[in-house]
Amino acid sequence: SEKVTEGYLIAGKDKQSISIEAGIVSVIGKIERLNLDILDDLQFSTDNSNFDLVIKKLSFDEIVLSDFRLPKTSIRSIDSNEYLILDIDNKILRGTLSLPKTGEFYPEVDLDFINVNLSQDNSKSTFLNVFNNLDVKLKLKTKSLLLDSVNYGSWSFDLIPEGNAIHLENLEGIYGKWGLTETSEGLSRLSISRSRLGWKSELLTKVYSGSPEKAFKQIGIEPNFEMDTFEATLKVNWPSLPWELDYPSILGDVSIDAKGLLILEQTELQTQNNLLRLVNIFNITDSFEKVTNLDFRKLYKSGFSADSVKGRVDLFKEKIVFNTPLLFKSGSSEFAWKGEIERRESGALGELNLEMIMTLPLREYLPAYALLLGGPITAGVVYIAGKAFERNLDQLSSGSWAVKGTLEDPKTEFKGWFENKKK
């Protein structure tokens, strides 16, 4: 039979104005309902055809895939050598779907916005449709992701199905003052898997901010600190779908790298927020000064400051642990924290079992009146918390402190001085 090389197809009963173009089959019209389930039974390809398929404008009152429904939608095609590009517009999403004309590429979705209503009763069944039916790799990006009409910024990722799991690889996003990108190993991934035990989400990525104070305010935390930059590498998991995340169920580890920290002086911390209470524990200008009588406020007039903060926090079901010390560096001084904090079932942090090792040049911290616990400076000897120092006070010395009690009522105990081996 003779092959079609040009012409037009009008969908629906409404009259349309259209003309024949050489080498083009044009499509125009209106369809009341399109069921995408039928696409599994169709074998459509433009390979080796001697015409271009052009959708001038197709309108659908409803597009259906199982329980998922798109409202009134307008579609037109855009010319491309590698892809059949469909421009799609409705009240839920607007953007392009690029379908490869050959096997050298995979489909791409590029959206101006997408509005996902997680509060709807069928939101989980909609996800299940994607989880159960997606069998090809997709590249997806959107300038604006709206969840229940709240804008969570721009995101991009490769959507890869694999057995009983689906992976969001090369995950990147910007949400206000927060950013999400690949780790130092070049990985950024959210994996969602299903087993007999239920759903599990695993996140490996790096979160960062160049304006941490504004970033924390953005998520409802009024910070008791100032900070220049913040990075955290997350290797965490939780036993639910991503949007059902519950803080007490998060397990894994978080590596922190912050610059320019200043913990502000506050007479009383009213908030019950775990993060802010934990940050307050690290403010050595208060509790540690009372134990040693060293004058921390001589250097930290506005609150405790650190040039950098690095370390790792391990999250277990019943505790959080500093196996790799959380190291605060401030000039020639270092403050290393290790130990663990009880993690209660509610998510609240309980009993403290921490050790802090302080390494510093003592002269910088001597009070102006030169009277310390144990006595004054005499004959080249200085007594600090009962230990005599005869050597040059400009050299580094180290002391150890134990921190017990709770975040609300911490108890600090001086354990003693020891020789520091650093040059």
Please state what every model-predicted region is.
Residues I20-G23, V27-I28, L58, S98-F113, ...:
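Flexible beta-edge/linker motif
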Residues A215-I219, T292-D295, Y383-I384:
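Extracytoplasmic loops and strand-loop junctions of Gram-negative outer membrane beta-barrel proteins
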Residues N35-L39, N115-S119, L146, G179, ...:
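Gram-negative outer-membrane beta-barrel proteins
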